[in-house]
């Protein structure tokens, strides 16, 4: 069975969000197996590596419509290709970043984002010491230049790393300027029109979960 006839495209908008969160884990694990020279991988193998039930992995992979071989599993190259395509990692999505503080600066320095289909092409801030400079080759403009740069770059994704007190204001500006998706790193739950995609990634919320679990384990 060749890679071409193993892969069938499917609409990712119908996939449950927990599944979408797990698929990149499978992809990373399968890439590691490829580096070790593996040609085939089964759900059971992946399960042992990432501690997720094999039946759940098989169910998740059914959404991307790749067929495996009985007693052999999935062809590694085919599985990598279909997962990267399904998750949108094969297409480069340009983005603007708003707020070049410690977190924003770290994201600008993270060249690894491009391996997952995201390229931050410009950043915006109001700090005079930052405006007009570059970080990791990425230009930093004044926030007032956003609309002009939208026309120049044609970006549809905004990465939000501003202070919480201006998160909604900057979001409103982004949406009014044509941004269609917001990756929100602030702990503020921004409000957007229904047609705007928002992905909330609050580091502080994850810290709270970790601390709570740690305290619970210590009590036991």
Swiss-Prot record:
Give one Pfam family. CoA_binding
Tell where it localizes: Cytoplasm
At the top level of its lineage, which domain of life is listed?
Bacteria
Query: What are the alphabetically sorted keywords of the record?
Result: Cytoplasm, DNA-binding, NAD, Repressor, Transcription, Transcription regulation
Gene Ontology cellular component list: cytoplasm
Biological processes per GO annotation? negative regulation of DNA-templated transcription; response to redox state
Keyword Cytoplasm annotated: yes
Checking InterPro entries in the record gives: CoA-bd, NAD(P)-bd_dom_sf, Rex_DNA-bd_C_dom, Tscrpt_rep_Rex, WH-like_DNA-bd_sf, WH_DNA-bd_sf
Q: Which residues bind DNA?
A: 25-64
Q: Name one GO molecular function term.
A: DNA binding
Entry binding sites for NAD(+): 99-104
HAMAP family xrefs? Rex (MF_01131)
Quaternary structure and interacting proteins, as annotated: Homodimer.
Q: What is the documented function of this protein?
A: Modulates transcription in response to changes in cellular NADH/NAD(+) redox state.
Family that this chain belongs to: Belongs to the transcriptional regulatory Rex family.
Q: What is this protein called?
A: Redox-sensing transcriptional repressor Rex
Natural source organism:
Bacteroides fragilis (strain ATCC 25285 / DSM 2151 / CCUG 4856 / JCM 11019 / LMG 10263 / NCTC 9343 / Onslow / VPI 2553 / EN-2)
